[in-house]
Amino acid sequence: MAFIQMNLLSQNLMRTVPVNVILPADKQQMPGMPAREEKPYKTLYLLHGIFGNYMDWVTGTKIMRYAEEHDLAVVMPSGDNSFYVDHPEAMNNYGKFVGKELVELTRKMFPLSRKKEDTFIGGLSMGGAGALLNGLKYHETFGYIVSLSGAFLIEELPHRTNDTVNVLERR
């Protein structure tokens, strides 16, 4: 199991962003068990909740064990308190960062599957809202979406944009 902490330079956010990555790359094989087939990893982009940070999933859950048991790469970016939506006036395009840039960068850096059906996005609270919004907006990238207690008081979203509302109104 590899646990990687890094800072990525984001063009969409105009700054570096802390990101944690879990890769079950050096998984121990028990004697008599078949070796792992060498193929790109299925990947979960996992978003934290408001007032949290990119370490919450590692320190407060069993995500590392889950990743190892399911041969799953997990990418956990810092989302500040952005709701993972674009704020072009402030040059904080978190939606584009999570839905496009982060996926492209991590696929270049790590052996991650490029298949839609192997690429998931999920989150808790604010991250759950961001996962649903960006999973729908970037539906050509994400095959599955998980929203855990998604914070969907859309009228009260900070820096709400018409784009945010339009994504939820689509069927």
List the predicted regions and their residue ranges.
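Non-catalytic cap/lid and distal C-terminal segments of serine-dependent acyl enzymes
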Residues: 1-171
